Amino acid sequence: MNMQQPNQPVMRFIADGMLGRLARWLRILGYDTTYEKVITDEALIERAVRENRRLLTRDRRLTLRKLLRDRHILIVSDDIEGQLHQLHRDLKIDLDLTHRQGYRCADCNVALTTISHNDAASLVPPFVAEQYQAFLQCAHCRRVFWPGTHWQDLTRRLTAIRARSLDTQP
Protein backbone atom coordinates (compact mmCIF):
# COMPACT_ATOMS: atom_id res chain seq x y z
CA MET A 1 0.00 0.00 0.00
CA ASN A 2 1.48 3.26 -1.09
CA MET A 3 0.47 5.63 1.69
CA GLN A 4 1.57 8.73 -0.20
CA GLN A 5 -1.17 11.18 -1.09
CA PRO A 6 -1.14 11.12 -4.90
CA ASN A 7 -3.56 12.90 -7.22
CA GLN A 8 -7.26 12.46 -6.62
CA PRO A 9 -9.31 10.82 -9.39
CA VAL A 10 -11.40 13.35 -11.30
CA MET A 11 -14.60 11.37 -11.83
CA ARG A 12 -17.21 12.03 -9.17
CA PHE A 13 -20.21 9.82 -8.51
CA ILE A 14 -23.51 9.72 -6.67
CA ALA A 15 -24.92 6.25 -5.96
CA ASP A 16 -28.60 5.50 -5.51
CA GLY A 17 -29.98 3.69 -2.46
CA MET A 18 -29.34 0.25 -3.95
CA LEU A 19 -25.59 0.78 -4.41
CA GLY A 20 -24.20 1.54 -0.95
CA ARG A 21 -21.60 -1.21 -1.16
CA LEU A 22 -20.37 0.04 -4.54
CA ALA A 23 -20.14 3.58 -3.10
CA ARG A 24 -17.87 2.30 -0.30
CA TRP A 25 -15.59 0.52 -2.77
CA LEU A 26 -15.32 3.58 -4.99
CA ARG A 27 -14.39 5.69 -1.96
CA ILE A 28 -11.68 3.22 -1.00
CA LEU A 29 -10.38 3.53 -4.56
CA GLY A 30 -10.25 7.30 -4.09
CA TYR A 31 -13.35 8.34 -6.03
CA ASP A 32 -15.50 11.08 -4.51
CA THR A 33 -18.78 9.16 -4.22
CA THR A 34 -21.82 10.43 -2.38
CA TYR A 35 -24.48 8.04 -1.18
CA GLU A 36 -27.69 8.51 0.73
CA LYS A 37 -29.77 5.47 1.47
CA VAL A 38 -33.00 7.47 1.58
CA ILE A 39 -33.38 10.20 -1.04
CA THR A 40 -36.09 10.97 -3.58
CA ASP A 41 -35.37 10.39 -7.25
CA GLU A 42 -35.79 14.11 -7.90
CA ALA A 43 -33.31 15.08 -5.17
CA LEU A 44 -30.84 12.45 -6.40
CA ILE A 45 -30.99 13.76 -9.97
CA GLU A 46 -30.84 17.40 -8.86
CA ARG A 47 -27.75 16.70 -6.76
CA ALA A 48 -26.06 14.78 -9.57
CA VAL A 49 -26.61 17.72 -11.94
CA ARG A 50 -25.73 20.45 -9.40
CA GLU A 51 -22.52 18.73 -8.23
CA ASN A 52 -21.53 17.47 -11.69
CA ARG A 53 -21.57 13.82 -10.62
CA ARG A 54 -22.33 10.68 -12.59
CA LEU A 55 -25.36 8.90 -11.22
CA LEU A 56 -24.85 5.20 -10.56
CA THR A 57 -28.19 3.43 -10.42
CA ARG A 58 -29.84 0.03 -10.68
CA ASP A 59 -33.16 1.76 -11.51
CA ARG A 60 -33.75 1.76 -15.26
CA ARG A 61 -36.50 4.41 -14.90
CA LEU A 62 -33.99 6.91 -13.49
CA THR A 63 -31.78 6.61 -16.55
CA LEU A 64 -34.64 7.84 -18.74
CA ARG A 65 -34.77 11.26 -17.08
CA LYS A 66 -33.83 14.04 -19.50
CA LEU A 67 -31.88 16.06 -16.92
CA LEU A 68 -29.33 13.25 -16.63
CA ARG A 69 -28.44 13.12 -20.32
CA ASP A 70 -25.15 11.20 -20.36
CA ARG A 71 -24.44 11.60 -16.63
CA HIS A 72 -25.65 8.18 -15.56
CA ILE A 73 -24.59 4.56 -15.59
CA LEU A 74 -27.15 1.78 -15.27
CA ILE A 75 -25.44 -0.84 -13.12
CA VAL A 76 -26.58 -4.24 -14.33
CA SER A 77 -24.94 -6.64 -11.88
CA ASP A 78 -26.13 -7.49 -8.38
CA ASP A 79 -22.66 -8.38 -7.10
CA ILE A 80 -19.83 -6.00 -6.28
CA GLU A 81 -17.30 -7.70 -8.55
CA GLY A 82 -19.63 -7.38 -11.53
CA GLN A 83 -20.38 -3.76 -10.68
CA LEU A 84 -16.70 -2.82 -10.43
CA HIS A 85 -15.96 -4.78 -13.61
CA GLN A 86 -18.66 -2.78 -15.44
CA LEU A 87 -17.24 0.57 -14.26
CA HIS A 88 -13.70 -0.53 -15.13
CA ARG A 89 -14.84 -1.61 -18.60
CA ASP A 90 -17.20 1.29 -19.36
CA LEU A 91 -15.53 4.23 -17.59
CA LYS A 92 -11.96 2.97 -17.34
CA ILE A 93 -11.93 3.57 -13.58
CA ASP A 94 -8.64 2.59 -12.00
CA LEU A 95 -8.96 -0.54 -9.86
CA ASP A 96 -5.41 -0.40 -8.53
CA LEU A 97 -4.86 0.53 -4.88
CA THR A 98 -1.09 0.73 -5.23
CA HIS A 99 -0.72 3.99 -7.12
CA ARG A 100 -2.15 7.29 -8.34
CA GLN A 101 -5.30 7.74 -6.28
CA GLY A 102 -5.73 9.49 -3.02
CA TYR A 103 -7.83 7.47 -0.64
CA ARG A 104 -11.20 8.39 0.88
CA CYS A 105 -12.95 7.22 4.03
CA ALA A 106 -15.37 4.43 3.11
CA ASP A 107 -17.86 5.79 5.65
CA CYS A 108 -17.53 9.58 5.33
CA ASN A 109 -16.25 10.11 1.76
CA VAL A 110 -13.62 12.51 3.16
CA ALA A 111 -10.10 12.41 1.69
CA LEU A 112 -7.70 10.61 4.02
CA THR A 113 -4.54 12.33 5.20
CA THR A 114 -1.22 10.85 6.20
CA ILE A 115 -0.49 10.87 9.92
CA SER A 116 2.79 10.16 11.65
CA HIS A 117 3.55 6.84 13.27
CA ASN A 118 3.76 8.62 16.63
CA ASP A 119 0.27 10.10 16.23
CA ALA A 120 -1.16 6.78 15.05
CA ALA A 121 0.45 4.76 17.86
CA SER A 122 -1.98 6.16 20.42
CA LEU A 123 -4.98 5.50 18.16
CA VAL A 124 -4.41 1.91 17.01
CA PRO A 125 -3.90 -1.38 18.87
CA PRO A 126 -0.28 -1.82 20.08
CA PHE A 127 0.43 -4.77 17.74
CA VAL A 128 -0.64 -2.63 14.76
CA ALA A 129 1.68 0.20 15.82
CA GLU A 130 4.52 -2.34 16.10
CA GLN A 131 3.85 -3.97 12.75
CA TYR A 132 3.04 -1.00 10.48
CA GLN A 133 4.72 2.33 9.79
CA ALA A 134 2.29 4.03 7.38
CA PHE A 135 -1.09 5.36 8.50
CA LEU A 136 -3.92 7.45 7.09
CA GLN A 137 -6.72 9.16 8.98
CA CYS A 138 -10.15 10.55 8.19
CA ALA A 139 -10.40 14.15 9.37
CA HIS A 140 -14.15 13.77 9.87
CA CYS A 141 -14.66 10.50 11.80
CA ARG A 142 -11.00 10.24 12.94
CA ARG A 143 -10.81 6.60 11.86
CA VAL A 144 -7.24 5.39 11.22
CA PHE A 145 -6.27 3.10 8.33
CA TRP A 146 -3.14 1.02 7.74
CA PRO A 147 -2.05 -1.53 5.08
CA GLY A 148 -3.13 -4.68 6.95
CA THR A 149 -4.56 -7.98 5.78
CA HIS A 150 -7.88 -6.39 4.83
CA TRP A 151 -5.98 -4.15 2.40
CA GLN A 152 -4.26 -7.21 0.91
CA ASP A 153 -7.64 -8.92 0.47
CA LEU A 154 -9.04 -5.84 -1.31
CA THR A 155 -5.99 -5.76 -3.58
CA ARG A 156 -6.43 -9.45 -4.49
CA ARG A 157 -10.10 -8.96 -5.32
CA LEU A 158 -9.37 -5.91 -7.47
CA THR A 159 -6.57 -7.76 -9.29
CA ALA A 160 -9.04 -10.56 -10.11
CA ILE A 161 -11.58 -8.03 -11.45
CA ARG A 162 -8.91 -6.38 -13.63
CA ALA A 163 -7.93 -9.81 -14.99
CA ARG A 164 -11.60 -10.53 -15.73
CA SER A 165 -11.76 -7.25 -17.66
CA LEU A 166 -8.74 -8.27 -19.74
CA ASP A 167 -10.36 -11.63 -20.49
CA THR A 168 -13.52 -9.97 -21.83
CA GLN A 169 -11.86 -7.39 -24.09
CA PRO A 170 -12.31 -7.96 -27.86
Question: How does the language model describe each region?
Answer:
Residues 105-108, 138-141:
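Short cysteine-rich clusters marking metal-coordination/redox-active sites
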Residues 65-67, 117, 150:
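Short glycine-/acidic-enriched loop or helix-start segments at secondary-structure transitions
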Residues 9-29, 131-134, 147-166, 170:
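Extended interfacial segments that mediate partner engagement and assembly in macromolecular machines
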Residues 122-135:
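Short linker/helix segments within small regulatory modules
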Residues 102, 112, 121:
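SIR2/sirtuin NAD+-dependent deacylase catalytic core
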Residues 99-103, 130-133:
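Flanking scaffold residues of small Cys/His-coordinated metal-binding clusters
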Residues 110-117, 146:
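Short functional micro-motifs and their immediate structural scaffolds
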Residues 1-100:
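Long, charged N-terminal interaction/targeting segments
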